[in-house]
Each structure stands twice: as structure tokens, then as C-alpha cells.
């Protein structure tokens, strides 16, 4: 179940638009719960959408291409608590893109089982040319690593394209770059 509009780039991955190797091709179904008109979570619709087959709830922290504000970690934590009160074993995954380092806590501090994002944005400090990250419970990270690579390899491999130096420089600079971006918003 997804609580937001999916990025158009994910429609083929999910199977909204048919594609070889999509989640739908693997038998994964998808339900989307729209936000209320004011951009907040529709708790009644979320409750109705969760059933015995629901294994994962995906929450997009940033507004993406929408006009709503981004969700705060506090709002995400409240939603996760609500979801887990209905189905405690459901995995709550947060697409954390653009949200890293903008608060003193991250979604994993308020109950998210898994957070994912792009290294090209905040965590890469503007220097990482490719990549993404997965963080969370050991089981979630391990399962995702095997889906992203192949059986037997898991998180032991991954593309770096010979740019590890840029990754490490980006990781080092990321908090300062993000702070600068936030400060520039205050002065605009």
C-alpha cells in the first residue's frame, strides 16, 4: 500500500504501467491511498486499505511533484504508530529523499522499519553521481539487498563505477551542504 501518488518513474516498477520484471509480474499488488484535500493523511481510508495481505506501507516524506508540504518526522511517526496499531507486522518504509539531515531525528527514530533515498541528493553532498541507500532493521535491509542484487550476494556488492572518492567526499560534506540549503531558504 502506498500513501501518496507514485512518481511516474515508479509506475513501471510497480506495474501500474505494464513492464517486464515489475512487482505486479511477481504477484505483488498495489493500493494507493490518497491524501485529504489539505494534504494530510486520510486515516479512515488508510484503516480501510490495510488488510491481512498488506505487507508493506510506503510513505513519501517529501512532496515530490505534489503541491503539498513535505511530511515532518513527527507526522510520519504518528502515521506509523497508527498503521502498526492496525497491523503490527506490516513493514513501514519511508522514501526519505530530500529529508535527510533537515531534522534532529530521522523516520527510523519514530518506528520506520526501512528508510530509502538517493545518494545524489542530501546524503551525497552534491558530489555523489549515482546511488541510493537502504537503512533500517537487519531483516529489511538484508531482504532489500537480495532483491537489488542476486541470491548469494546481497549487500556484498554494488555498483560504484570507480567513484568511491566522490561518495566519501559527499558523505563528509552532506551535513554542511544541507545546512546551507536550509539557511538559503530562510533568506529568500
Positions of the model-derived regions?
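Conserved small/polar residues in nucleotide/adenosyl-binding loops
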Residues: 1-6, 186-188
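Conserved PLP-enzyme active-site core in the AAT-like
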Residues: 4-182
Amino acid at each position: 500500500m502506498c500513501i501518496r501518488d507514485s512518481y511516474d518513474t515508479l509506475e513501471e516498477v510497480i506495474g501500474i504501467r505494464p513492464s517486464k520484471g515489475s512487482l505486479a509480474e511477481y504477484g505483488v499488488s498495489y493500493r494507493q491511498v490518497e491524501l485529504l484535500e489539505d494534504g494530510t493523511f486520510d486515516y479512515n481510508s488508510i484503516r480501510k486499505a490495510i488488510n491481512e495481505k498488506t505487507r508493506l506501507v510506503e510513505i513519501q516524506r517529501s512532496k515530490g511533484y505534489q503541491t503539498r508540504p513535505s511530511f515532518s518526522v513527527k507526522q510520519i511517526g504518528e502515521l506509523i504508530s497508527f498503521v502498526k496499531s492496525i497491523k503490527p507486522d506490516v513493514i513501514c518504509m519511508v522514501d526519505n529523499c530530500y529529508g535527510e539531515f533537515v531534522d534532529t531525528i530521522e523516520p527510523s527514530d519514530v518506528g520506520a522499519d526501512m528508510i530509502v533515498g538517493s545518494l545524489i541528493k542530501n546524503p551525497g553532498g552534491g558530489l555523489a553521481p549515482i546511488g541510493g541507500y537502504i537503512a533500517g532493521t537487519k531483516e529489511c535491509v538484508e531482504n532489500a539487498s537480495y532483491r537489488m542484487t542476486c541470491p548469494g550476494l546481497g549487500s556484498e556488492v554494488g555498483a560504484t563505477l570507480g567513484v568511491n572518492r566522490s561518495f566519501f567526499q559527499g558523505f563528509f560534506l552532506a551535513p554542511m551542504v544541507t545546512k546551507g540549503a536550509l539557511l538559503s531558504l530562510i533568506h529568500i
